[in-house]
């Protein structure tokens, strides 16, 4: 194939020109071509012949252009998942042999053109259009001549009307004019369908503003809380007195409510004993003769209830001082060494603290409740800390004694 010869590829979207030495009679229509917009424009023919034959060739080219457009739409708008139909091979459009113009008289322009138009609808993929340049912007729905199931009607390529076989120029020109108007209508419909697919900008803006309004409405404070503040009247003296009495009663009730949970905490897990002193004592657990001042227990419960292990540590420190912890063992047993004078901690006190901590943590949903093996470990940690504190205290005391032992030199007067 020479460089000047260009044929149409099966998969490409472009149409290629064919050199003029291509000897097929059907495709040799050099006087018809398309511009960029797909409009048919007439060029000067290479050879001078009958004018009616030239119009027939133009009609043939326009028919191929329209059939190619509709066929392309039908192939691209197939259902998803279905294999698109292949383009059939181009069929030869050969006009029937000319008859004598004197054999039939030319009919009127309008009826003849309408009759021919009904018999020459655009076909679906019958002619792929060698002479048309496909416009990439032309993508629309099938032409209204399609049937209900989406397929275009197929019409025989040969024209059945006698008027098409004759050489009446007025009829042929009318057919060509209607084909051109058909092309324009298809382009207008393509632009309309593209505009329908894109929503207008005003609609998008209105939807966005509606969404923003909904979000603002959610953030607004309900008006019920604002109404009593805005509607207020100046109360009289009697109303003020009534309000003061009601406020005092409410404050007393609130104070009772605040004190009752604290008392319930202690009463539920400890027994309060009446004593002549102002500060009553609380028995931590039943069956254990372990008592603690109520004020001290309340302060521990209000400050150290983040975890059960921390509460247990603070209660142990409240019952045992550093010297007792430093000279004790956590499990209550005596060390067997010769010079080891450590004794076990009082298991009565440790047991009461343990029972109180378990009940309090389970009732108030306190996290980090010590496990069965954690109690002894916590006691060992407290013993080590007490020893460190005593050691630091002894070192500080020794340093203070050394400073006191250094006497200032006497001054001679």
From Swiss-Prot:
GO molecular function, one term: DNA binding
Gene3D superfamilies in alphabetical order: BEN domain
Phosphoserine: residues bearing it: 328
Gene name as annotated: BEND7
InterPro entries according to UniProt: BEN_domain, BEN_domain_protein_7
One Pfam family from the record: BEN
Domain of life: Eukaryota
Origin species: Homo sapiens (Human)
Transmembrane segments: none
Name of this protein: BEN domain-containing protein 7
Span of domain BEN: 287-392
UniProt cross-references to PANTHER family, sorted A to Z: BEN DOMAIN-CONTAINING PROTEIN 7
Coiled-coil parts of chain: none
Record's compositionally biased regions (Basic residues): 211-222
Effect on the protein of changing residue 313 to T: In a breast cancer sample; somatic mutation
Glycyl lysine isopeptide (Lys-Gly) (interchain with G-Cter in SUMO2) cross-link, renumbered residues: 16, 56, 85, 243
Keywords attached to this entry: Isopeptide bond, Phosphoprotein, Ubl conjugation
């Amino acid at each position: 194939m020479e460089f000047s010869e260009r044929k149409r590829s099966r998969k490409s979207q472009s149409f290629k020109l064919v050199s003029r030495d291509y000897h097929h009679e059907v495709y040799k229509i050099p006087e018809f071509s398309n511009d960029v917009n797909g409009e048919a424009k007439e060029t000067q023919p290479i050879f001078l012949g009958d004018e009616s034959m030239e119009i027939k060739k133009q009609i043939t080219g326009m028919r191929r252009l329209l059939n190619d457009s509709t066929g392309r739409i039908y192939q691209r708008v197939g259902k998803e998942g279905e294999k698109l139909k292949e383009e059939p091979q181009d069929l030869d459009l050969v006009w029937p042999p000319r008859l004598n113009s004197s054999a039939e008289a030319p009919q009127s322009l309008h009826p003849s053109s309408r009759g021919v138009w009904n018999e020459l609808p655009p076909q679906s993929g019958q002619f792929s259009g060698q002479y048309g340049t496909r416009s990439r912007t032309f993508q629309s729905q099938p032409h209204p001549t399609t049937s209900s199931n989406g397929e275009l009607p197929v019409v025989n390529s040969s024209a059945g009307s006698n008027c098409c076989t004759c050489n009446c120029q007025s009829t042929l020109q009318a057919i060509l004019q209607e084909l051109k108007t058909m092309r324009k209508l298809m382009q207008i419909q393509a632009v309309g369908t593209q505009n329908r697919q894109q929503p207008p900008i005003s609609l998008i803006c209105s939807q966005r503003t509606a969404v923003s309004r909904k979000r603002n409405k959610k953030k607004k404070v309900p008006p019920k809380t604002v109404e009593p503040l805005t509607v207020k009247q100046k109360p009289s003296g009697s109303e003020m007195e009534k309000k003061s009495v009601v406020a005092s009663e409410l404050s007393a009730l609130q104070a009772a409510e605040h004190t009752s949970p604290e008392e319930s905490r202690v009463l539920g897990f400890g027994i309060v004993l009446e004593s002549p002193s102002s500060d009553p004592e609380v028995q931590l657990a039943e069956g254990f003769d372990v008592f603690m001042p109520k004020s001290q227990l309340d302060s521990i419960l209000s400050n150290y209830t983040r975890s059960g292990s921390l509460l247990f540590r603070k209660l142990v420190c409240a019952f045992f001082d550093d010297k007792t912890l430093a000279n004790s063992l956590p499990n209550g047993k005596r060390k067997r060494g010769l010079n080891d004078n450590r004794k076990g901690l009082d298991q009565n006190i440790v047991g009461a603290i343990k029972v109180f901590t378990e009940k309090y943590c389970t009732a108030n949903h306190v996290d980090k409740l010590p496990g069965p093996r954690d109690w002894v470990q916590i006691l060992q940690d407290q013993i080590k800390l007490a020893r460190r504190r005593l050691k630091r205290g002894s070192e500080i005391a020794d340093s203070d004694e050394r400073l006191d032992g250094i006497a200032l030199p006497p001054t001679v007067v």
